[in-house]
Amino acid sequence: MKKKNGDIKKALDKENKIYFIKRLYELIDHGYMLEDSLEFLLIQYEVADDEIKKIKEKLSNGSKLSDILGYLGYSQLIVSKIKFAEDYGRIEDMLVEVETYLKIKKIQLVNNKVFPNRYFYHYY
């Protein structure tokens, strides 16, 4: 039996963060409650049961999705976007926007690794 990942931030690397947001949107969009959606996804990523319990307790104590995403290691920019959406009731729309943003950032990162000096010749 595979050991569950005790470090929640390691379970969600950059690639998994994109997929996590996508699946979270899909579950919420299909009518699942936030807590159930998060628990389902965290189980998929083999996050330790005590970490899942902590997150559920945070939600029960009033934490919002933005707080949980910060706890999961998402950037302050992502957390701020979700916090804004929470204030204006557009969480599903913002999850789609965040997924798109993360995909674009990934493409930019890959392009910079493949073509690190692509702008060099334009200046000389």
What are these regions (language model features)?
Residues M1-R118:
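Catalytic metal-binding core of the metallo-beta-lactamase
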